[in-house]
Curated annotation (Swiss-Prot):
PANTHER family listed in its UniProt record: GLUTAMATE-1-SEMIALDEHYDE 2,1-AMINOMUTASE (PTHR43713), GLUTAMATE-1-SEMIALDEHYDE 2,1-AMINOMUTASE 1, CHLOROPLASTIC-RELATED (PTHR43713:SF3)
CDD domains the record matches: OAT_like
Organism, as annotated: Bacillus pumilus (strain SAFR-032)
EC number(s) recorded for this UniProt protein: 5.4.3.8
Molecular function terms, GO-annotated: glutamate-1-semialdehyde 2,1-aminomutase activity; pyridoxal phosphate binding; transaminase activity
The name this protein goes by in its record: Glutamate-1-semialdehyde 2,1-aminomutase 2
Cofactors, names only: pyridoxal 5'-phosphate
Length: 430
């Protein structure tokens, strides 16, 4: 397509001397697709522009937060209005109350909420709360589910069905890892094995109700309800990590869509409107154990800062039940178009969706867990990624990340994307 990435290349060369790997978050290094990262300059609506002047239809959307698209006029105006009065006070502001009330109205399981500054803070704090509330030590998580970079969550499974964790990153103490039990996603039998062996010491089960960091992998029928049933049976807490799915999958989050009520919920991304944010909330009797109303400590200098609260509030105000019907309609069209193109050109492809979260894998096998996701054709994805970028479509630079839709994506954007996929599949056909 004759695109130049020379300025991005030069910027990355400089960045590698300044930051570990040249980036402030590993996925931005584009290692999974074997190419240099693209440096972005600005965005508007569903479009972004790199420092070389190339335009893209954006399906990354800052990894999910920008559900209204880039620089939404009302969100930007609200941030500017608040910034003129003060960016942070280290004291409470009215907008914290407003956002908390709106979240609780749309997600009834969140009776009380605590704002923090990142999804990682939210999940770490929720685990501490679960342990403090139950007086137990162990946490169950699922293989391939990412819950931030807290020590007790950077854990992988061993060779057994239900195993005590081993550190997945240097620097995580084995003692910390030993209190994390990892089991396969969408596998209720393995959960039962874990509880039969460790149930008296399991404080909680943390799960992405739709997995979003092994690609997009929805829960199978009965999986989430099965988790609800077994946690209630053993007196453990069910924690939904809705940092990604919250207000993306549905107007009432994934828990509303699937009709399963957790004890605690972690939020982030969308509720900050593109600014750093996180939150955790749930049953009042559990949440009131957090300081200063209870003994379980958690604090943050910028928690509930007025800029993020305002951006999140304005974002949620613009989302209606009809917004999610539009997401479904556009998602249906993308799935139809991309799946048909794959069939036409003999490309093995499995398409997964949940609300405005989209994932596809270069494999004929149904993807229901991390082991299957890992068997997708990663080399083909890398080729596909580079070709799509050259045609002006910005996708996540990893097979194991989802695509996102925004209210700013037009039918024309969707049709151009499908036409581009058709051209790229024809070129990649083998």
């Amino acid at each position: 397509m004759g695109r130049s990435y020379e300025k991005s290349k030069q910027a990355f060369e400089e960045a590698q001397h300044l930051m570990p790997g040249g980036v402030n978050s590993p996925v931005r290094a584009f290692k999974s697709v074997n190419t240099d990262p693209i440096f972005m300059e600005r965005g508007k609506g569903a479009k972004i522009y790199d420092i070389d002047g190339n335009e893209y239809i954006d399906y990354v959307l800052s990894w999910g937060p920008l559900i209204l698209g880039h620089t939404n006029d009302r969100v930007v105006e609200s941030i500017q209005r608040v910034a003129e009065k003060g960016t942070s006070f280290g004291a409470s502001t009215l907008v914290e109350n407003e956002l908390a009330k709106l979240v609780s109205e749309r997600v009834p399981s969140i009776e009380v909420i605590r704002m923090v500054s990142s999804g990682t803070e939210a999940t770490m704090s929720a685990l501490r709360l679960a342990r403090g509330f139950t007086g137990r030590n162990k946490i169950v998580k699922f293989e391939g589910c990412y819950h931030g970079h807290g020590d007790s969550l950077l854990i992988k499974a061993g060779s057994g069905v239900a195993t005590l964790g081993l550190p997945d990153s240097p620097g995580v103490p084995e003692g910390t890892a030993s209190n994390t039990i990892t089991v396969p996603y969408n596998d209720l039998e393995s959960i039962q094995v874990a509880f039969q062996e460790f149930g008296d010491d399991i404080a909680g089960v943390i799960v992405e109700p739709v997995a979003g960091n092994m690609g997009v992998v929805p829960p199978q029928d009965g999986f989430l309800q099965g988790l609800r049933d077994i946690t209630e049976q053993y007196g453990a807490l069910l924690i939904f990590d809705e940092v990604m799915t919250g207000f993306r999958v549905d107007y009432h989050c994934a828990q509303g869509y699937f009709g399963v009520t957790p004890d605690l919920t972690c939020l982030g991304k969308v509720i900050g409107g593109g600014l750093p944010v996180g939150a955790y909330g749930g049953r009042a009797d559990i949440m009131r154990q957090i300081a200063p109303s209870g003994p379980i400590y958690q604090a943050g200098t910028l928690s509930g800062n007025p800029l993020a609260m305002t951006a999140g509030l304005e974002t949620l105000k613009q989302l209606t039940p009809e917004s999610y019907e539009e997401f479904r309609r556009k998602g249906d069209r993308l799935e139809e178009g991309i799946s048909n193109a794959a069939k036409t050109h003999g490309i093995p492809l499995t398409f997964n969706r949940a609300g405005s979260m989209i994932g596809f894998f270069f494999t004929d096998e149904e993807v229901i867990n991390y082991d299957i996701a890992k068997n997708a054709d990663l080399a083909l994805f890398a080729e596909f990624y580079k070709e799509m970028a050259d045609h002006g479509i910005f996708l996540p630079p990893s097979q194991f990340e989802g695509l996102f839709l925004s209210t700013a994506h037009t039918d024309e954007d969707i049709e151009y994307t499908i036409e581009t996929v058709e051209k790229v599949f024809q070129k990649l056909r083998r």
